Regions:
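N-terminal loops that bind phosphate or other acidic moieties
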Residues: 1-372
Length: 372
């Protein structure tokens, strides 16, 4: 994996931004999350008053477990989804258009051939990752290719002038790889993020099944905090090799590269969340550059895992719209929250600008000014 350097947030810009926010014509702290988002972007961009951000969307396509017993569709559902992106008819693309956000759709590893889809960026490494019950999800060489490609896309989107990128995925059977990646990094027990399904094996049977596969690969880490920086990186890369898959590996590198360019990243589901966890474990400073977005209404699989991912990261999703389609829709809608925070920061007037009185008591006293 290539080397990179991520810098901390620029504190003087954040302090100046916070002072302006506290002096906007509203009760102090009343816009809550919008305020903290704007303040963080000031630190990311080293600008006390960021505005007119340039947005983008990156959708990565890859199937999982193609040689596993659950593969009955053989990529047909994924192909249908990617075909809609090729035609430009998805909800994600509609939402992105409202923010003038360019949408990149990259095929890393769908099981079916997409060479005939002219609007899909063809970067196929292999046609789907393995079932780790058979062999590691991807080879070491495939892992390196996915990582380098992720960094290359971060370089490319930065060169295009983007400042915030919403990430998402298209692909079948990503649940198991996301589950194992999440549990290994957060240290939670499988029973805490598996939900009973009356139509299949019990939770206990599923846990035993997973352990029978993953235990032989030695991916468990007793205490991540006890590892050195290089040991953490190597442990994460081994995890991605065994149970990550092409999309999670690519997105991990993209997130690291984006943060090194001071680009923010918005994530949504368990696949993008797993990549965030991997990137944050490799370099904890990544956490300052990532933002949650939506909760998907999928209580059996996605919801418990995503909840654990957000708990570990110390964040809460902003949007609760009972969405069933992911495909970067949640993260793209998350861009609208960031856009709203920029409008708050730049379009609202301060007490001085509006020539109105400030708070005479309470939290705003002494913090708000009505004259120079």
């Amino acid at each position: 994996m290539r080397t990179f350097k991520i810098e901390p947030l620029h504190v003087p810009s954040m302090e100046a931004c916070r002072l302006r926010i506290d002096n906007l014509t509203k009760p102090i702290y009343s816009l809550a999350t919008l305020e903290s988002i704007a303040e963080r972007f000031a630190g990311i961009l080293r600008n006390p008053k960021p505005n007119h951000l340039r947005y983008g969307v990156l959708v990565v396509a890859a199937d999982h477990l193609v040689d596993g017993p659950q593969n009955t569709e053989h990529g047909s559902e994924s192909y249908d989804a990617i075909e809609r992106f090729n035609e430009g008819t998805t909800a994600t693309q509609g939402a992105a258009a409202k923010l003038n956000a360019v949408v990149h759709v990259v095929n890393l590893g769908l099981e079916q051939d997409t060479a005939d889809l002219a609007n899909i960026e063809q970067q196929v490494i292999r046609k789907g990752s393995h079932f780790f019950g058979v062999e590691p999800a991807i080879s070491r060489e495939e892992l390196e290719r996915a990582l380098e490609l992720g960094f290359a896309y971060a370089d490319r989107l930065h060169a295009d002038g983007l400042q915030v990128v919403a990430i998402g995925n298209v692909g079948e059977r990503a649940f198991l790889d996301s589950l194992v990646t999440t549990a290994t990094i957060t240290g939670c027990a499988y029973e805490d993020i598996l939900v009973h399904n009356e139509y299949g094996p019990t939770v206990e049977q599923r846990i035993a099944h997973i352990h029978s596969f993953v235990d032989r690969f030695n991916i468990d880490v007793d205490d991540w905090s006890a590892l050195s920086e290089s040991e953490r990186r190597d442990a994460v890369l081994n995890l991605l090799h065994v149970a990550g898959g092409l999309d999670i590996a690519f997105l991990t590198a993209f997130i690291l590269g984006a943060a090194s360019h001071r680009m923010a990243v918005v994530f949504d589901n368990v696949v993008t969340g797993a990549a965030i966890l991997a990137a944050v474990t490799i370099d904890p400073l990544v956490k300052d550059y990532v933002f949650p977005s939506a909760v998907y209404d999928e209580p059996i699989h996605d919801e418990p895992i995503h909840k654990e991912q957000c708990r570990f990261l110390g964040v809460k999703p902003y949007l609760h719209y009972s969405l069933l389609i992911d495909e970067a829709l949640g993260s793209t809608m998350g861009l609208s929250i960031i856009d709203a925070s920029m409008h708050m920061l730049n379009d609202m007037k301060t007490f001085i600008e509006a020539e109105v009185s400030v708070a005479e008591d309470g939290a705003g006293k002494g913090r708000q000014k009505d004259k120079e």
